[in-house]
């Protein structure tokens, strides 16, 4: 069995991250991948701050410290086990699993990877998981020609979803965020209107823009109680409430409108589908990116070497305007 020694990130406690040396053994069902690039997810940022996730099927390690961190990455297969039939050495792959991906190398099972489609640039393909998740949300949001669409949250996913809504024929795309830098980027990438809850009355603004009716579609991509409650107030009667965010703490919601106005709820979390469904959806979700219809490169705001992982996470912790921070081995 092939053995690889790798630097890998370990989170020992809140804001206590270090690189350790791990030995990866390629078992008969394993695939070893040499990383090209890794990204910090919003969930990684929460973990860094000490908010570990609840126990779910997504996590095959207990959510407790020390925690082996990382899931957004892509690279090249360098070893496969004797029972692996789906991949071979030299294949370019995208990670779809929590396998301590902040590392030079990581080990995965076949169902935790996706082939890189359309000869995508590896910088983009290495972020294939968050990109395809956001694109899946945008493509399945129910946006129709002429709709007014509000995206709550101008982070990595929100920026992609907003672009997707525009390409699907939305008449008006509104992005809501508390950071002016994110709103400026949203305008540059095609949003018609941006609103800052710290300065604007979002509910009144959306009502004014829609003659009192409300938005046809609201996508919640911020993940806060305030965002969910605002979203509930700005959707029109029989409008579409699209869930994207992963909310890991309880929130208090006013749900009377959900019933009274017959809102339609659409859950658009790709990673919670089976891996067989992801094999179908990932190429479809990434095709508009490969075609140049959705621009993701401006969303990569900061780059570090893996050796500087502490500096990268400190930036993510302190500067919410850093939309996507990436590391190279």
Where are these regions (language model features)?
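Short, surface-exposed secondary-structure boundary micro-motifs
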Residues: 36-38, 80-82, 98, 154, ...
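Glycine-rich cofactor phosphate-binding loops and adjacent beta1-alpha1 units
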Residues: 141-143, 189-266
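N-terminal glycine-rich cofactor-binding segment
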Residues: 8-26, 42-74, 94-97, 118
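C-terminal substrate-binding/catalytic core of Rossmann-like NAD(P)-dependent dehydrogenases/reductases
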Residues: 207, 252-302, 310-311
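A glycine-/small-residue-rich N-terminal strand-loop-strand element
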Residues: 74-98
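Mid-domain Rossmann-like dinucleotide-binding core that forms the NAD(H)/NADP(H) cofactor-binding site
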Residues: 124-199, 204
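C-terminal hydrophobic helical "lid"/dimerization subdomain
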Residues: 1-4, 8, 229-232, 281-329
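NAD(P)H dinucleotide-binding glycine-rich loop of Rossmann-like/cofactor-binding domains
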Residues: 59-71, 92-152
């Amino acid at each position: 069995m092939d053995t690889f020694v790798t630097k890998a990130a370990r989170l020992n406690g809140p804001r206590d991250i270090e690189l350790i040396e791990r030995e990866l053994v390629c078992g008969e069902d394993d695939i070893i991948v040499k990383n090209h690039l890794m990204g910090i997810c919003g969930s990684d940022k929460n973990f860094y701050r000490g908010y570990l996730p609840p126990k779910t099927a997504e996590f095959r390690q207990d959510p407790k410290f020390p925690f082996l961190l990382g899931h957004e990455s892509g690279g090249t297969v360098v070893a496969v086990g004797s029972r692996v039939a789906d991949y071979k050495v030299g294949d370019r792959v995208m990670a779809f699993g929590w396998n301590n991906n902040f590392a030079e190398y990581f080990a995965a099972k076949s169902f935790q990877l996706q082939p890189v489609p359309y000869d995508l640039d590896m910088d983009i393909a290495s972020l294939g998981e968050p990109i395809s998740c956001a694109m899946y949300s945008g493509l399945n949001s129910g946006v129709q020609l002429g709709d007014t669409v509000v995206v709550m949250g101008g982070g990595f996913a929100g920026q992609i979803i907003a672009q997707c809504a525009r390409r699907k024929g939305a008449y008006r795309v509104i992005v809501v965020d508390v950071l002016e830098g994110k709103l400026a980027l949203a305008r540059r990438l095609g949003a018609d209107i941006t609103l800052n809850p710290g300065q604007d009355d979002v509910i009144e603004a959306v009502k004014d823009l829609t003659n009192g009716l409300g938005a046809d579609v609201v996508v919640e991509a911020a993940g806060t109680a305030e965002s969910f409650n605002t979203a509930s107030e700005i959707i029109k009667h029989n409008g579409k409430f699209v869930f994207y965010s992963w909310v890991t703490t309880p929130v208090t919601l006013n749900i009377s409108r959900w019933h009274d106005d017959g809102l339609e709820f659409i859950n658009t979390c790709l990673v919670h589908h089976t891996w067989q469904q992801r094999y179908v959806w990932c190429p479809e979700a990434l095709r508009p990116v490969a075609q140049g219809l959705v621009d993701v490169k401006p969303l990569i705001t900061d780059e570090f070497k893996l050796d500087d992982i502490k500096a990268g996470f400190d930036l993510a912790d302190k500067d919410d305007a850093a939309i996507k921070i990436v590391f190279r081995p």
